[in-house]
Amino acid sequence: MIRFALTIGSVVALLATGTAGAADSNKVLHWEFRAAETGFDPGRVTDYYSNTVIEAVFERLLTYDYLARPSKLVPEAAEGMPQIGDNGKTYLFRIRKGAYFAPDPAFKGAKRELTAEDVAYSIKRHMDPKNRSYWQWLVDGKIVGLDELAQKAKVGVTGLDYDARIPGLEVVDRYTIRIRLTRTDYNFTYILAMPAMSIVAREVIDAYGEDSNAHPVGTGPYMLTRWARASKISLEANPSYHGFVWSFQPGIEPGDNEIVARMKGRKMPVIGRIEISVIEEEQSRWLAFQRGELDILLLPGTFAPVAMPGNKLSPELARRGVTINQLIDPEITYTFFNMRDPVLGGFAKEKIALRRAIAMAYDTAEEVRVVRKDQAVEVQSPIPQGIAGFEPSNKSGIAFDPAAANALLDKFGYRRGADGFRTLPDGAPLVIKRWSRSGDSEARELDDLWSKSLKRIGLRMETVTTKFADLLKMSRQCQPMMASAAWIADYPDADNFMQLLSSANIGQSNYACYSSPEFDRLYSAARQLPDSAERNAIYREMNRRLEADTVWKLGVSRVRTMLIQPTVKAYKKHPILHAEWAFIDMERER
């Protein structure tokens, strides 16, 4: 929730040092991705893995305090927190001087400083029709004059006029920008801290055009030096980075005081290189960590009983000096039903009954126990714990009940044939096609569990496997009949999850392609309110609408257990940030 009393004089947590010379090239952190990245242009990608790299390469106006829980915003490219006026509709930011982009041929040998113009340009890109930004929903309808500018680009032939001045993005001077909103947005400061709002240089985008995903050039602590798609990513400390002094205060969680004692006053970053390997198979990731080829590992669920018997670190790992850091991710997994699919979609009673039966046939508790190895908790609404708007008393109205699911299908004419499988009410064959990502043993386990679940109510299921990046693309295009997805918080507010069902976000984040005037009306009403009991009441009504239409089958929030080699120091998983690399230390590589 926005606090309107914030001023430019707010405390700056990331104190600039004027140099990034502290980075040691002999300190190399080995990291893993469980799925392939898609690229590194902040305006063109949405996946977790790409955004992890984007977070390290670019800066945003705001970021998060490394240790504060609940998550707390602090300045990054901004000099301080914004001056907020006009009842939360005007934001005045002063840009930190001396923040330079990493060297790149696009700058023709000149040092290039980040300015207020870059902030305005980066925001405008999300509304450029040519970019087809999946993050358009962050600014669509929010910034005074921006929609009108985008509309001119849609009907014109020259594209978006980035040089045009609009009231909502007023560049006051080289280091000052005033952002004017069309209405109060209680989450706008959170939005400005998202990887999608990373600040890019126009010269770089112009130079590389459609290949901008391969050429991320930012003012952040690291820069891309090697990219073997879907295999290896190498980052090195950005020689142009201004650096900062580690000055975070301990929170209330165990280990914070030890982290502060080790890191306070250090010039950051100190790790000189990040080596990222894309390793899709769980066993391969586990063995790589066991061999010391990975420094930090997100514990694969399959190996949770081995690494953490009884939910305690195994004696073998403890003897080696391995430590753990755990949190329940502020996320949801869910299975969406394509509301445009001719078999499964639509609002006819028999279609809703089919979706409801499928949802009731799936045992999420079995998923937690068998697939997740108890490294997850069931979610009861689209708003996970740790997020403003979460209510522990909320319980899903769609429970595991295969008997009721069978009765529902019988009632609406989905009859069983001689082979035991059901047909459509008109007698035509009925096949449920569930799309899934390839190359992942966990995904295969989920495929098997879904197949078993549907078989128990007489539904034949076929699995369509595809690469993770292609599955995302197809989902935005409303192609899968049904598929599973996950959404981890971009910012710690329920709005970030409820937007997944807004009809305005079809083609972006609304993979179910759900369009409900009633849901949209409620969503619009909720966005006018701060975090409050009144807003929570609207969210409960939205959840009832979602369940009545049965657009999703809710899944879990995963327990993120990070295994940490003894060479890594001061690591703590952040609930919102993806890449904590600039905040930690490690022993030198021998």
How would you label these PLM feature ranges?
Residues G85-N87, D173, R229:
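Residue-level recognition of beta-strand termini and adjacent short loop/turns
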Residues M1-I2:
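N-terminal secretory signal peptides that target proteins for export/translocation
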Residues W135-V157, Y162-L192:
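Non-catalytic accessory/assembly modules
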Residues G555:
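Active-site-proximal polar cores
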Residues G18-A22:
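Sec/Tat signal peptide C-region and signal peptidase I cleavage site
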Residues A5-A16:
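Bacterial N-terminal signal peptides
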Residues Y66-L67, T90-L92, R96-R132, R165-L169, ...:
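Extracytoplasmic/periplasmic ligand-capture domains
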Residues E32-D86, V217:
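N-terminal lobe/hinge region of extracytoplasmic solute-binding protein
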